[in-house]
Amino acid sequence: MNIEELNGKKLTDVKLTDGSLEFICDDGSIFLMYHDQNCCESVYIDEITPEWREILIGQTVTYAYESMNQDLGPKSGWESSYTWTFYRISTTAGQVVIRWYGTSNGYYSERVSFIQTAKPQDENRPLIGQKREIDGHIYRLS
């Protein structure tokens, strides 16, 4: 899966945590951008457009894409393998650039993952927070 899945989605929230970004859409779908850390590499968000919340939240994504660059060079001289990964997300309010930096000894992945963690709500599926009876018990869906 790639970040182009966000094209046309309206973002109701974006959560930045230590090492990941979660994109929550108005149709119930949720996407996660992260790196699954191993032992011998370091991959992290190096920089993000300062006004990212204002540009993304409540807006529809008009264009989202990923690009990589190794021509920028390593952040310090000792890295034998490094990757700069850029994610650009545009809305009518502007563009956000998320710059990830990864370094390793060359044997470990420096890639950023983008996955869907929740699918859009549909008519046949109860919305989160609604009650449903299963085997005689009432459950609140979360």
Name these PLM-found stretches.
Residues 1-125:
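Surface-exposed, interaction-prone regions used to assemble/regulate multi-protein complexes
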Residues 126-142:
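Short, low-complexity, charged amphipathic interaction modules
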